[in-house]
Amino acid sequence: FMSGHLVVEAFDEGGNIIAYRQTDNEVVDDGEQCILKMLFATPQTSNSGRGEYTSTGACTGTLTGAWTNIAIGTGTTAAADTQVVLVNETSSTGGLERGPATTMTWTNGTGADSTKIVLSRTFTSDSLTAHTISESGLFNSTVGDANGMLARQAFTGVALSTGDSITITWTFTVGN
């Protein structure tokens, strides 16, 4: 059993909190299929790292690494299992581009305790244009036009002006 949670915190230039959101996230079909293929991969196959199974419709992109890259966007479409990219990623917007998590914390569970990982990244806007951030995704690549999305979630928009920052925190729990 895998569950996920997303926390969004926004701050103005002075460090004052201007928005807080939290919600469960949507692990998309691509992510679910890729997780299983990576777990049960056979290294001697041509699809090394993706298992030896034929992919149709999901997990067809190259698995270039762990899902540690966080992206944000302005799309407002609800999260859906079939999505493979953000609706409108801020891939070329000053300070709001996709990048690796700057904090990753593992908790190893035993017995009744769950195992989890918490990944977060802070984006600081240096754009002269205001943006309303309303979606985030977790990817296995820093390339903005690549697939490889594990999870996505939309949330009530957070308006950012120059100097404002937004911290995205993804938590994934496996087990109990």
Model-derived features: positions:
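Small cysteine-rich, disulfide-bonded extracellular modules of the LU/uPAR three-finger superfamily
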Residues: 1-134, 141-176
